[in-house]
């Protein structure tokens, strides 16, 4: 019993790290190679175009190149993010399948309990084959979940998963799944521990708060025994939503930090967001956008607004006078028109709000300015006096080499636009290496426990064969 218990705990831990290692390898391949081309190439091409622009800002060739590279940058970023999201869906499918498998095992255990009890109740026969089959199921369950088991004097086995009764007294308390309407992600929960309301058609709507099978907010560590079971590893890796840069904000980061896929989605989106907003801000400054409080005609004051006077003939402006943006949002405008207390019209930059996805410059809401795609020379880079705007072109170049960005709030090292993606991939590779080494150590532990267990439980084939020969000779 002790060796069974040890073996099952260690094999559950082994599966946790096996899944975690596979997830890291998949994420690394998503980041490294997409249709044979790494995103780093796209980033390097964009950086090269910015350097070319700084050499000859008013050339229609360099302006055309930067718009083209910006467009590729957005397309490739979308493809990487879509790949990560698709992998979340893949994990979600595996989670569904494994919950179904666990429930199937639970019902099989009930049947085997009944059969074993029936055979052994007389106290003469021993249901060895049935016990072997039951042990096999317990081994499989132990790989998927953090389970414990006990056998009563009648030969029936009870099982707990994550400390909650799963098989007990002739009942299998099946795990149910609640599907998130926005993402389709499922959360395994215990129906007997959840409250519910009943619809008119008789279907139940569950409130699963506190009834989840796994508490994913607890820190993962071997000391706490929270690193056991392949299903938990899948749930952690998938996360509970599609993350973006707002998830990396101080105070929010803990909710995504333990999920490999959400963490990378957030860090990758943050990189794209930083590049996009920095470039737009540099162009806005050239167009005369300033920061400060703006008093409006209706008596209200916009605090810390970014705004400029409406000036359709101004430098770095569109026909309607809005400051030119290289990157625009798909769902909302970059600027809105307001009337100031002085009676003049102003363009005010629309602020990003974390709780309003359509206001954000995130990967799913990004495009290159369609007017610039058609006519890159709108960028101009020629000031009112006819001179080249070298200052703005140089500012764009400098933006790529400023060491002022971190991957996430827990990382101290500052990085640049040029190196950010490489650092991101290295972080995944390093984490993957750590998971793999833990997994390999764990495999050795499982094998050692299994061989000790077999010495006690298993009969060697040689021994079995010689017993059969003895038995035949006796006839």
Regions inferred by a protein language model and the residue ranges of each:
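Structural signature of extracellular appendage/secretion-system components
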Residues: 1-475
């Amino acid at each position: 019993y002790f060796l069974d218990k040890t073996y099952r705990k260690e094999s559950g831990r082994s599966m946790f790290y096996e899944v975690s290692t596979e997830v890291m390898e998949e994420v690394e391949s998503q980041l490294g190679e997409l249709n044979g081309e790494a995103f780093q190439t796209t980033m390097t091409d964009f950086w090269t175009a910015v350097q070319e622009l700084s050499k000859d800002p008013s050339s229609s060739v360099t302006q055309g190149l930067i718009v083209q590279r910006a467009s590729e940058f957005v397309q490739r970023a979308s493809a990487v993010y879509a790949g990560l999201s698709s992998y979340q869906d893949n994990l979600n499918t595996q989670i569904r399948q494994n919950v179904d498998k666990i429930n199937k095992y639970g019902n099989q255990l009930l049947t085997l309990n009944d059969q074993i009890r029936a055979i052994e109740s007389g106290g003469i026969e021993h249901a060895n084959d049935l016990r072997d089959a039951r042990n096999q199921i317990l081994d499989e369950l132990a790989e998927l979940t953090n389970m414990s088991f006990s056998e009563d004097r009648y030969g029936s086995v009870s099982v707990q998963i994550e400390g909650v009764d799963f098989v007990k007294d002739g009942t299998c308390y099946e795990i149910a799944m609640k599907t998130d309407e926005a993402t389709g992600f499922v959360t395994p929960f215990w129906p007997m521990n959840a409250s519910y309301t009943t619809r008119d058609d008789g279907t139940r709507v569950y409130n699963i708060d506190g009834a989840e099978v796994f508490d994913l907010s607890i820190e993962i560590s071997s000391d706490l025994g929270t690193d056991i079971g392949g299903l938990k590893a899948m749930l952690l890796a998938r996360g509970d939503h599609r993350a973006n840069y707002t998830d990396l904000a101080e105070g929010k980061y803990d909710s995504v930090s333990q999920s490999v896929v959400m963490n990378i989605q957030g860090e990758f989106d943050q990189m794209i967001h930083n590049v996009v907003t920095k470039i737009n801000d540099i162009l806005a400054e050239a167009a005369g956008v300033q920061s400060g409080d703006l008093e409006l005609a209706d008596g209200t004051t916009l605090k810390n607004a970014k705004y400029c006077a409406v000036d359709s003939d101004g430098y770095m402006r569109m026909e309607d006078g809005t400051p030119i943006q290289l990157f625009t949002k798909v769902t909302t405008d970059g600027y809105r028109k307001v009337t100031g207390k002085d009676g003049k019209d102003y363009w005010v930059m629309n602020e990003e709000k974390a709780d309003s996805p359509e206001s954000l410059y995130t990967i799913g809401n990004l495009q290159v300015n369609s007017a610039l795609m058609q006519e890159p020379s709108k960028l101009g880079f020629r000031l009112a006096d006819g001179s080249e705007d070298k200052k703005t072109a140089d500012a764009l170049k400098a933006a790529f080499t400023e060491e002022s960005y971190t991957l996430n709030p827990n990382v101290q090292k500052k990085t640049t636009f040029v190196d950010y993606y490489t650092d991101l991939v290295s972080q995944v590779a390093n984490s993957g290496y750590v998971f793999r080494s833990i997994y390999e150590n764990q495999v050795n532990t499982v094998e050692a426990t299994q061989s000790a267990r077999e010495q006690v439980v298993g009969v060697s084939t040689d021994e079995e064969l010689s017993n059969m020969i003895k038995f035949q000779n006796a006839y």
